[in-house]
Amino acid sequence: MSILKSSIQPNGLKEVSLGNSIGAFEKLLRDEYQRGNVVFELDTHFLIVVFMDSIIVKVNLLYNKVAQISFYNKFLGKFNDIGIGSTLGVFMDTYPTAEYDDDQNFFYIPNSTYENMAFFFENPYSFASDNKLEEITINDSSLLVICSNT
């Protein structure tokens, strides 16, 4: 199965998990690199690995741990039946306790095993558009954590 169709787990995707070292997904990285599906970028303290212009993995080089996994574009995987293209209405039906972070423009699910996930929608959310929940779709979703040395 293509990594683009993998289901999202609370801590990652396939061999790529938050807090793991790059060695944990070395085989996947090597296989996808040989197929021409991987691009590497360097940022301050981070190695950024881009799979098929649809999955971005940020590895904290100070700790050699995966700090963030983001899903975009052609990613077809789902997280509890929520994925790119899902509407805000379906998301809110599935997660009625979800909260919106006005400053960062994403939804998250507090006090749950999924609170490290952020769901970004195509337009900034506003209560004025609350009656148009079926018209607002997810355009990317990300697993976010802050790396520690533990």
Indicate residue ranges for each PLM-predicted region:
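Short helix/turn-capping signatures at newly exposed starts of structured segments
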Residues: 1-115, 120-150
